[in-house]
Amino acid sequence: GGMVIDTQSDLPHARQMIKMFGKVWPAMPKRVVNTHEDSDHVFGNQLFEGAEIIGHRSLPERMKKVAEPEEIQGLMEAANGAVKGFLLKLVHPGLVAAGRQLDEDYDFSGIELVPPTTLFDDRLEIMLDDAEVHIIHVGPCHEVGDALIWMPKERVLFAGDVLFRLCTPMGWVGTYEKWFETLDMIVDELKPEVIVPGHGPLCGVEGATEMKAYLEYVRNESRAFFDKGLKAGEAARKIDLGPYSDWLCPERIYMNIERAYREFRNEPFDKPWDQAKTFDEIYRVARARGIVPTF
């Protein structure tokens, strides 16, 4: 019995989560589901020893590419080193800011990358005691392995990072159209009463509707900037955020504009991101808007 969906960004936060749900469940869960491959959803996997860990078939290889704890630790050490940090900031101020923020918020020591042990392709249906659980692959929207966890009887949906609530999304791999299709499926087919987003507070289907409206707005505005010949970074500094100005982390809009630009240029949807350049652009957008960047 018992199932955990995603396992936090580091071991201290994962242990805190285990302690919290220990108040309502007497034993460690026997199942874990990773909604996708990003580090903030899988870095606590190792604490669930003996549990069945479920994820899309792409996750083991994708985790090696995007969730290597050694790389994150190296970034933090470089950002905080007196000489290295100073020199790195001259070249990549955003990368240094990201490394220092991660160091303040998380402790990545002792993390071992533990991939899912049960892999699925399109859909996996399991029984959790008397509750039916559908795990549905919908990626790539935010990432390759995006999966929804749907409980039809309870009408509860765990959306992973397919849905950010009142928080600017970041799309690493995928297309706008794929993301639109998935959000439409949530609203028109699943019709959940409660949605647990990957980031942000609980919501109903209005969260998916708002998310789609945001993405449509950004793509349309990006088209206008693209046609005028502005670079994505320039567009991110100039765009009117309109009704989304109060969303957290508005500077991340750079990634969403750059994703739109890639589509306009007919570039591959899985083209790798230059992490240093991306964080630097996010940093510059934040500075231009007079806010502290959040990575």
Region locations from a protein language model:
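Divalent-metal (often Zn2+) His-rich catalytic cores of metallo-beta-lactamase-fold enzymes
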Residues: 177-242
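Active-site neighborhood of phospho(di)ester-bond hydrolases with catalytic His/Asp-centered motifs
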Residues: 5-7, 28-38, 54-56, 138, ...
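Divalent metal-coordination and catalytic microenvironments
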Residues: 6, 21, 36, 48, ...
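Active-site metal-binding motif and surrounding structural segment of the metallo-beta-lactamase
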Residues: 12-55, 191
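C-terminal regulatory/interaction regions
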Residues: 228-295
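Active-site-proximal loop/helix segments of hydrolase catalytic cores
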Residues: 132-189
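Conserved beta-strand hairpin/beta-sheet module of binuclear metal-dependent hydrolase folds
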Residues: 1-23, 147-160
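Metallo-beta-lactamase
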Residues: 64-137, 183
